[in-house]
């Protein structure tokens, strides 16, 4: 029998200390990784529920196990809320991750060795959009498109590549692109060559849910997303469609289960249901509007301090800063900012002279800082501190600048906690 006083702290102090240290790190560091966010206590409560014990292979009303009556309620709630949130006709809430959602889409609609046309990882795409090191680049014949020297998608180049390689599927979406994607243009190109248009909106799903970034649902045959990132829910995946093709919906359904996954994670689906309810609240739209405002405010500071911002700005939650002109590496910038309790990630920039593990840039995102309450004035000050640190790399005053910046970071983090006590 389990008792109420059982706890990790007494049973496994080494693990407990790691958990406590991570709690402290999140509270005392400013999180600027574009793919990270903070889940609400309600979401975390659902993840820690007794649904973690339940096997529920199948779908609501069609399970292979008994005792699923409450799991059915949870999953149907998540499905219905996601449909309302995104304007979808079809939703599958079972994918364990965005990558598994993407794998299910490929498996449903195309065959091994079919050609896919996706965005180059080095130009802002994702591993699962056809990178050679990914299953998507090994199982399928992957052709890649990129961005111009100005940091924008060249739709005519996409069209020409599509005409040349005749893909069965065009993959749109990104992990490091700061502008608006013309979903209608991508569908036009897909229709011209008879391809499916598959959109991975993982990075901008929260913005789309709030109506501050254009939705791909009216144009794509199928859309996937993660449920964390801008959406701010648990770590997981989601498949959606509004194409109206019941045959596609059936293929997607069977591609998730039984083709790619067994039992769904019902506790995570419960957390997704909470997340979708939160995203339907009026204040969620204000939050997402502020995410974009904060990103734009930071961009202006970096530009004023003579740092190059790829595409010269942002229309979403993220932007890339290039250090090619400064001769600085993304790895060095990442490390220096980390010493000051500012967390970013090194990122390749277009035509990057450095290797992918070194890079010449960093990616900055505002979902997490905005969620903990940072306003435009706060992120402008933060961007200035970051530039101070970057300017000092290799100079005699570097350690002093790091110490001064860290003190400022700790002060604002104390004033704007992630989880108020």
From Swiss-Prot:
InterPro entries (alphabetical): PyrdxlP-dep_Trfase, PyrdxlP-dep_Trfase_major, PyrdxlP-dep_Trfase_small, Ser_HO-MeTrfase, Ser_HO-MeTrfase-like, Ser_HO-MeTrfase_PLP_BS, SHMT-like_dom
Site annotation Plays an important role in substrate specificity: residues: 228
Record: residues binding (6S)-5,6,7,8-tetrahydrofolate: 121, 125-127
Modified residues (N6-(pyridoxal phosphate)lysine): 229
Gene3D superfamilies: Aspartate Aminotransferase, domain 1, Type I PLP-dependent aspartate aminotransferase-like (Major domain)
Pathway membership: One-carbon metabolism; tetrahydrofolate interconversion; Amino-acid biosynthesis; glycine biosynthesis; glycine from L-serine: step 1/1
Reaction(s) catalysed by this chain's protein: (6R)-5,10-methylene-5,6,7,8-tetrahydrofolate + glycine + H2O = (6S)-5,6,7,8-tetrahydrofolate + L-serine
Source organism superkingdom: Bacteria
UniProt-annotated location(s): Cytoplasm
Annotated GO CC locations: cytosol
Coiled coil: none
Function recorded in the entry: Catalyzes the reversible interconversion of serine and glycine with tetrahydrofolate (THF) serving as the one-carbon carrier. This reaction serves as the major source of one-carbon groups required for the biosynthesis of purines, thymidylate, methionine, and other important biomolecules. Also exhibits THF-independent aldolase activity toward beta-hydroxyamino acids, producing glycine and aldehydes, via a retro-aldol mechanism.
Subunit structure: Homodimer.
Family: Belongs to the SHMT family.
Name this protein carries in UniProt: Serine hydroxymethyltransferase
């Amino acid at each position: 029998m389990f008792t109420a006083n059982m706890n990790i702290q007494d049973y496994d102090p080494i693990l407990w200390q790691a958990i406590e240290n991570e709690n402290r790190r999140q509270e005392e560091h400013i999180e600027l990784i574009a793919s990270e966010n903070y889940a609400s206590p309600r979401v975390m409560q659902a993840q820690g529920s007794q649904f973690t014990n339940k096997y529920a292979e199948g779908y609501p009303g069609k399970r292979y196990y008994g005792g699923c009556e409450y799991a059915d309620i949870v999953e149907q709630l998540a499905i219905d809320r996601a449909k309302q949130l995104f304007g979808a006709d079809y939703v599958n809430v079972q994918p364990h991750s965005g990558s598994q959602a993407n794998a299910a889409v490929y498996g449903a609609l195309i065959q091994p060795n079919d050609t896919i046309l996706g965005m180059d990882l080095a130009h802002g795409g994702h591993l699962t959009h056809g990178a050679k090191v990914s299953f998507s680049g090994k199982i399928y014949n992957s052709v890649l498109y990129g961005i111009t020297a100005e940091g924008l998608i060249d739709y005519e180049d996409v069209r020409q590549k599509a005409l040349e390689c005749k893909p069965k599927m065009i993959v749109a979406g990104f992990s490091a692109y700061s502008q608006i994607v013309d979903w209608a243009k991508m569908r036009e190109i897909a229709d011209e060559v008879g391809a499916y248009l598959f959109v991975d909106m993982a990075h901008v799903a929260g913005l789309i849910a709030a109506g501050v970034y254009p939705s791909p649902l009216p144009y794509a045959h199928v859309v996937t997303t993660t449920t964390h990132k801008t959406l701010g829910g648990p770590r997981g995946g989601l498949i959606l469609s509004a194409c109206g093709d019941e045959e596609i919906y059936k293929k997607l359904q069977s591609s998730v289960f039984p083709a790619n996954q067994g039992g769904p994670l019902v506790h995570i689906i419960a957390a997704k249901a909470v997340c979708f309810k939160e995203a339907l609240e009026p204040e969620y739209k204000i939050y997402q509007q502020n995410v974009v405002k904060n990103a734009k405010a930071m961009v202006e500071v970096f530009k004023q301090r003579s740092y190059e911002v790829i595409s010269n700005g942002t229309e979403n939650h993220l932007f890339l800063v290039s250090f090619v002109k400064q001769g600085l590496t993304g790895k060095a910038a990442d490390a220096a900012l980390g010493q000051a309790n500012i967390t970013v990630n090194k990122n390749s920039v277009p035509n990057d002279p450095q290797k992918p593990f070194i890079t010449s840039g960093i990616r900055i995102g505002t979902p997490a800082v905005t969620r903990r309450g940072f306003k435009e004035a706060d992120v402008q000050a933060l961007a200035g501190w970051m530039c101070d640190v970057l300017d000092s790399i290799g100079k005699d005053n570097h350690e002093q600048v790091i110490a001064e910046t860290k003190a400022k970071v700790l002060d604002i983090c104390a004033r704007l906690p992630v989880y108020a006590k």
